[in-house]
């Protein structure tokens, strides 16, 4: 019997919008529980992803990007999610993009906890050709905050991920596992399905569609043999509907097909997915509407 104590705890993955937090979280867990797109602020909720190793259990909290430019109800809500996560977790992983330090990165620094539990992760290091450039970039950041450790990674190429996990594990408190060994997330499957559909929307029409778009699962009927899902895509304006549909419905057909395929992989059975569009004017700037649509 091993004398090594078991460690378990919560790990917040934070950073400015579109810096690679969800890609990193998915890579560490080894499964897709957070959606990814080129569009900033794709992650809106606090997502818990779970990884269990022989002597540790990591509960990763993938947070929305901390927003400093816009002050609408949704952005205020997402910033509350970030600040709450920072206050509650055992370890903070602050993700920055190699070679790209912005005002958004700098404005997050005062919110970071004391150094004993803060790790700086420099993502996308495969895009930096010279080591001296990377060293100079990191040196400027650590001069502004006393990080406990610095780990350069490439989530896409799986570089340095084990080293990052070891650094996190060393800072987790001793304790019993919080979840079963095979648990990947504490979010229900219908939540993940809604997120997968939203990801497809942002990937296909994100450049044309504003942020006032969300997905609500209105029907979820699962049997041993198959799953039937009815999903409502909520937009803010009538003009958003034709963007989503595309000429002859080609956009929506592709969005639904790709989402259905991903959901089928998730539940490991055939899926019938019905998607329709509803206009709810100004929902993203009303806190009551955000709560009605399942935002924290």
UniProtKB/Swiss-Prot annotation:
TM helices/strands, residue ranges: none
A molecular function (GO) term: GTPase activity
Main location: cytoplasm
Cross-referenced PROSITE patterns: G_ERA
Region (G2) residue spans: 41-45
Region named G4: 123-126
Positions annotated to bind GTP: 15-22, 62-66, 123-126
Keyword terms of this UniProt record: Cell inner membrane, Cell membrane, Cytoplasm, GTP-binding, Membrane, Nucleotide-binding, Ribosome biogenesis, RNA-binding, rRNA-binding
InterPro entries listed in its UniProt record: G_ERA_dom (IPR030388), GTP-bd (IPR006073), GTPase_Era-like (IPR005662), KH_dom-like_a/b (IPR015946), KH_dom_type_2 (IPR004044), KH_sf_prok-type (IPR009019), P-loop_NTPase (IPR027417), Small_GTP-bd (IPR005225)
Span of domain Era-type G: 7-174
Domain KH type-2 as annotated: residue spans: 205-281
Record flagged with keyword Cell membrane: yes
Region described as G5: spans on this chain: 153-155
Membrane topology recorded in Swiss-Prot or TrEMBL: Peripheral membrane protein
HAMAP family for the chain: GTPase_Era
Subunit structure: Monomer.
Name by which UniProt lists this protein: GTPase Era
Origin organism lineage: Bacteria, Pseudomonadati, Pseudomonadota, Betaproteobacteria, Burkholderiales
Gene behind the chain: era
């Amino acid at each position: 019997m091993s004398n090594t104590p078991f460690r378990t705890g919560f790990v917040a993955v934070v950073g400015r919008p579109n810096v690679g937090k969800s890609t990193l979280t998915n890579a560490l867990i080894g499964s897709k529980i957070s959606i990814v797109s080129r569009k900033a602020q794709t992650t809106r909720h606090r997502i818990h992803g779970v990884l269990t190793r022989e002597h540790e259990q990591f509960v990763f909290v993938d947070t929305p990007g901390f927003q400093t430019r816009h002050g609408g109800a949704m952005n205020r809500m997402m910033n509350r999610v970030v600040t709450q996560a920072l206050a509650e977790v055992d370890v903070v992983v602050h993700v920055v993009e190699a070679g790209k330090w912005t005002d958004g990165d700098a404005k997050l620094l005062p919110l970071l906890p004391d150094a004993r539990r803060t790790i700086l992760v420099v993502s996308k290091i495969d895009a930096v050709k010279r080591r001296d450039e990377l060293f100079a970039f990191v040196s400027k950041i650590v001069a502004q905050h006393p990080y406990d450790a610095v780990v350069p990674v490439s989530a896409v190429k799986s570089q340095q991920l084990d080293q990052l996990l070891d650094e996190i594990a060393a800072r987790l408190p001793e304790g019993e596992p919080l979840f079963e060994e095979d648990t990947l997330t504490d979010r229900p499957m219908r939540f993940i399905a809604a997120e997968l559909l939203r990801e497809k929307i942002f990937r296909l029409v994100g450049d044309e569609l504003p942020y006032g778009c969300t997905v609500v699962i209105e029907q979820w009927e699962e049997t041993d043999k198959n799953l039937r899902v009815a999903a409502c895509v909520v937009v803010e304006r009538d003009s958003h509907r034709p963007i989503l549909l595309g000429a002859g419905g080609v956009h929506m057909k592709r969005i639904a097909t790709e989402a259905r395929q991903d959901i089928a992989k998730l539940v490991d059975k055939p899926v019938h997915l019905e998607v329709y569009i509803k206009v709810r004017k100004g929902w993203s700037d009303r806190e009551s509407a955000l709560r009605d649509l399942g935002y924290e």
